[in-house]
Amino acid sequence: MPSSTASSEDAPITSTAWMNWKDVFLKCVQPMLAVVLLLRFSSIVDEAGFTTTIILVFFTFLVSLVTGWSACTVVSRKSSEVGFVKTMLAYSSTEFAISFSIIYLFCLLVATSTFLTSAAEAVLHIFSTFSLELLDGATHDLRLVSSVLSLITLALCMVRNRNARFVRTFIFALTCIAIALQLSSVMFRYGEYQLRRVSDRNAMIPSPPNEEISTIFAQLFPAAMCGLTILNIGSKLQNTAPRGALIAIAVSACFYGAAAMLDYVEFFARTSTSNSTGSAEYNEFLSYIYTTVPMAIVITLACVLSAVSTLKYAAVILQSLGRSNQCRCILWLAKGFGERDIPIRCLLLLSTVQILVSAIGSYDILCIPTTVFYLFAYALFNFYVFLVKLSDPEIPSPPTLLSLAISAACFIASLYTNRHLALFIASIFAISYCSLLYIIRRERNEDGEECPKSMYSSVLEQMHELQQEPDSRRHFHPQILLLSGSPAARPGLVDFAHSITRGKSLLICGYIIPKISNKVEQPMTWTEYLMQQSPCSRSYLLQLKIDKQINDWLRAREVNAFGAAICCTKQAEGANILLQTAGLGRLRPNILMLGYKTGWEKLSKESISEYYGMLSNAFDKQVGVIIFRNEASGFDVTSSIRKNGAPINDDEDLAEYVDSATPKLADQGSQKKDVPRGKLLNTFRKMSMAVNKDLESGGRRSTSSSTRFQVIDKHSISEPDQKIIMAQMFRFRKRIPNARIDVFWLREAGGLTMLAPYLLTQAGSFLEGAHIRVFTKTDGKDNKRINEEQKNMAAILRKFHIDSSDLHILPEFSKPPCKQTYDEFRAKIDKYKVETSSSGEPVDGSFDNNQIFNLREKTRSFLRASELIREHSSDADLIVCTLPSARPEIPSPIYLGWIDMLSRQTPPTCLVRGNQVSMSALRLKFP
């Protein structure tokens, strides 16, 4: 039931059915209501009194609620795991996970015996109503009936039931009807069954006295056995599934509180059943049968259904333990049978043990070990959550002190209920934990020195082999140097670059740490003081700190990239240094990628010259260049992630240095002029894995790239901007179904213009499976020239497995651009225009009439291309266009005006320029 293994209720392993919160609610609430509420609760109220009962109910469900809250947190963070053991292994250390799984296995085993014993008591109640006895009318009859029910439960676990969900819903509906009739006093209360309890005759252990508070608490606490149920369900959970477990606990608590209240004010009709043997009238006897026998049947069905669930849970856990490397002694139990991997051996073994446990006695006896086992398990789980919360306070688990208090209360309650049994359980956990800790440490001591050494030497040897590989065997791999600044400030830009590399080629996130100025006369922070100075030992220490944080953030976001931070006073020089020094051997970047500089027309000449210098240096080094623009929302999210205009992270000094204030290379369409610069390094760095696995249409799981989703604490972002920020952060992570990429091949400047969109259509990209359309221009007007160019382009497309029918040759390129387009272009660059001087060339960042006249043909071509892009591709999901070449004779304002016009008012646009190597010279290797 809970796992993909041994699931007679769920769909097959290959099914894409997902469990929503309603399914989880039914799995959790069924055992919490049927057993105690209908079987023992009225006697508990009579013996303990109203006040004591309310206190016990409050404590019981408080423990269950806090434990369920922690369990939902674990499932939300590790929802990709299947089953209880794998989820615990992913969340905790190996020794604790295995030891805790052993304790929880005993809990489920005893709970199964308790459920079947309760069902057997209900069956015996029916027999006693008709004065029937099988053996002795006492414990022997109970053992016989529970054994038969155990065999039925075993058969149900092995037989697949396609309508299990409907059966569960039907039995839950019957249980709710029985509870409603009981609470409304339409029927006689089945709770008066206390007069029909099974005799202690032939019992191994006599029932404890009912007047003791520990006995009453032990009879009540099995109602809270489902605090950890959600950990068994596995990865077939929708995002709202944890809600079902918490709702089940809350609903059960309301039922028990209402029952105690109604019992106290005597809303129920009380009818003695002790004298209904032969002296009562016949009509009264029939009325008694009609009111109690259906209730007993409902309890029997509910208990058997709960036993089926717990037995499956236990079998799957035992099978998982057998498959773990730490429990090789039970390897023979790991084998599964059939397509659904049913753990038949585990089921047979556990059923045998369960029958022996059920033979001990009735519910009044078995409820004590069940209570002690679950209390101890809850104490261990909440204490470990407390330790995890101390190490990482950002985890959305219960408050630290609350987890510690619940853990201590559970441990004390287990000792109070039965101290001998509690100490025995503690010894089981201690022995298993210490044994596993010893085994794991011994293995680490034996292999710990060899594994890192062998890994290092093998990787180094492979690097040498790669360096010495002959040219005839070398293939082109896109190795990207991304000038992202702080990756936490621009997660969308990093995600887009990772969609191209997908961990199969090199990706380096470069961060150039500049020297900042303190123009306002105010006290400087320590970080600002360091940045005022020239690069020195202290600034290098800060560089190492930032470099470590970048790599930690990349690892937490599951981006296969390396961080590279350097100290340099100028951005262009820093980019040039990174291009020359980043990487090792053959693993060196051959593509420079950066974001589009939004608002360049409002910046100074020095700023745009700095930006243009990075591009021209890349062209001089003959590496590919990619400029990515996301005009809709931009990349920089730090200016939006605010609380009342102040940084929300604690490390304000470092945040002001690490965030978007340096360097301004990405699109900042969402930036506001008066917003302070402090941002969110710590919030992004401490992002945790979440259950937010997007579902495609029809309930399908998204591609493997969706496993890289993360969440931010909802209180860390102002409410009005939360949706906008989340859309910016995950824009290039969510897979877009039926996507389309339009490629505008303006000229052959290297195969990168076609290679980049091809890589974006591969598995793991947000545009996986996208349709590619290619637009190109023709220089000739005759059909012969057009056909020749079409054949050349078709040959290029075949290399990328693109159908030639998706090629469109546009003769409209020869037309001049409209006046409005040209006026918009001139409005952007006129600020930087200077008068023509005979003394020499204009200063950097400006141009004169002669330069704009000499570049008139290129300007006309690019402006016309911008019009055609908006005409044909306004509804595309991504536009890839050839990037103009940045030559020294081209003024930076004119060049930035070209790329601005090519990418404005369009979907996300990727301007690409290859390394000037033709397609025929590139040795590309495709899957």
UniProtKB/Swiss-Prot annotation:
Residue stretches spanning the membrane: 24-44, 54-74, 96-116, 142-159, 166-186, 213-233, 245-265, 285-305, 346-366, 368-388, 395-415, 420-440
Extracellular side: 45-53, 117-141, 187-212, 266-284, 367, 416-419
Gene Ontology molecular function terms on file: sodium:potassium:chloride symporter activity
Pfam families, alphabetized: SLC12
Location within or outside the cell: Cell membrane
GO cellular component labels: plasma membrane
GO biological process, one term: chloride transmembrane transport
Glycosylation (residues): 275
Main location: membrane
Annotated keywords: Cell membrane, Glycoprotein, Membrane, Transmembrane, Transmembrane helix
Source domain of life: Eukaryota
Family matches, as InterPro entries: SLC12_C, SLC12A_fam
Topology of the protein relative to the lipid bilayer: Multi-pass membrane protein
Residues exposed to the Cytoplasmic side: 1-23, 75-95, 160-165, 234-244, 306-345, 389-394, 441-927
PANTHER family in UniProt: SOLUTE CARRIER FAMILY 12 PROTEIN B0303.11, SOLUTE CARRIER FAMILY 12, CATION COTRANSPORTERS
Family: Belongs to the SLC12A transporter family.
Name by which UniProt lists this protein: Solute carrier family 12 protein B0303.11
Organism the protein comes from: Caenorhabditis elegans
